[in-house]
């Protein structure tokens, strides 16, 4: 495809939908990934590795045809009522295995904002690489509670084993990259998105996740409002004892 673009004089703009997965997920990753960050562990194979290779190909096109504006959008993990994603599959069952001692920070992107970012990039013709993600984060523990699921903390090896068992009961198995993201999370800096590309998502991470829960009609195992009420009472008791 890029070879055909290179030979076509009429091509003036190429937009590549890439992914935040090129940064990987690792416990020693930076708190926030910028466009200049790289994975702490080499990406050996799979979708993240393929995405990074494709980014290299399109940059090569830009070097050979400097008259073409090449824009790379690294989208945060998307979510929404119509999306089948690692997170939606992870929350499919009533019990959600989590890595003992870890609470991943998740930055999401609503499916409608993903389309909005692609539209903005197409109209703006701004070359460069841009992180595309919503404001704010949601902790994995929050996501489990807000979807009415029950967390099942297990050692890291146990998550993969339990997920394989879930596959046998018709829930999709998660690959290694997805399990690492669900264990450690990933957050991107989106300054360039706002200041250079001129795009601002309409949905925050929390709003995007709540829209997914509403749209999927998830039946809570435990009423999320009851859990939040218990948390508020526990905080109030702790504050009284501490005063």
Where in the sequence are the language-model features?
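Catalytic helix-loop patch of NAD(P)-dependent Rossmann-fold dehydrogenases
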Residues: 27-72, 77, 98
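A conserved pocket-lining segment of Rossmann-fold NAD(P)-dependent short-chain dehydrogenase/reductase
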Residues: 38-44, 88-113
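Active-site beta-alpha turn of Rossmann-fold NAD(P)-dependent dehydrogenases/reductases
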Residues: 15-19, 74-76, 133
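Conserved Rossmann-fold NAD(P)-dependent oxidoreductase catalytic core, especially the SDR/UDP-sugar
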Residues: 1-46
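Mid/C-terminal beta-alpha module of Rossmann-like enzyme folds, strongest
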Residues: 115-177, 190, 209-210, 219-233, ...
